[in-house]
C-alpha cells in the first residue's frame, strides 16, 4: 500500500507529516518481550515468518504509525553467507571466525534460500496492513565491519587493521554489494513499498575513505535496484558534515540523519 509515507518520499503532496520509528518493533513493547522469552535464539526468531509478521505489526496495534518496518536484523546477510552469529548480553553480536574466501564463493541462490522466511514474512505483513511496508538491509561497509571485526566495533575498532588486505576487502565489498542487491530485490518482489539501507558504522570511516567504502558501494546498489521504482532511505550514521556529500553523490530517495548533524 503506497500511503502517506511513500507519497512523502516520492515528493507528492501530503496532508500531514508521516511518522515511523527505526526500532518501532522491539524490546520496549511487553508483548515483544514475551515472544522473546519463548524464543531465545534471535536468528531463529528472525527466520520465523509467523512471529516476524506478528512482531512487525505489534506497534501498529498501539500507535497510528504510517509504516510497518519488517522485524529483522542487518546481520542476516552475514548469516546467509555462512557466518554463525551469537547475541551475547552486554556485548551484542559475536560472529564466528570464518574463511573470507569461502564467503566470496557463496552463490546467490544459497543466500536467497536461507533468507526466504524474511520474504514470506513480508508477504504476510502486506496481507494484514494497509500501511507502507519497509524492508531493510545493512550497507556493505557496516556488514564488512561485522564480518572482519567479528563483533560490534563500538569499543574496539582499528580501520587500518580491518582494511590491511585491500584486495580482499575490495572483493568482499563487491560480494556484499551483490548479495545486498539480491536481498533488496527479493524484499521488493515480496511486497516491500520502501527499502531502508542502514550504514550503522559509516561514522568509523576516515573522511577521505567515505567515497570508497560508503558512498560508492551504496550508489552501486541504488543504481541496480532503481528500475523497480521503490524508494530507498539511506542512513549513513555518524558521518556528520559529510551528509551533504553523501546526498549529492548517492541521491537516495530519502535520508535518515542522526544526533551528530
Positions of PLM-derived features:
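N-terminal basic, low-complexity leaders that serve as flexible interaction/assembly modules and, when applicable
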Residues: 1-85, 220, 251
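Short low-complexity stretches enriched in small and charged residues
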Residues: 19-28, 91-94, 210, 231-234
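Short glycine/proline- and acidic residue-enriched helix-loop micro-motifs
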Residues: 38-41, 101-110, 161-169
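Beta-hairpin (beta-strand-turn-beta-strand) motif
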Residues: 73-75, 90, 136-138
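A charged helix-plus-loop insertion that forms the helical arch/lid used to bind
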Residues: 86-99, 153-159
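A gly/proline- and charged-residue-enriched helix-loop-helix capping module
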Residues: 90-127
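Active-site loop segments of alpha/beta catalytic cores
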Residues: 114-261
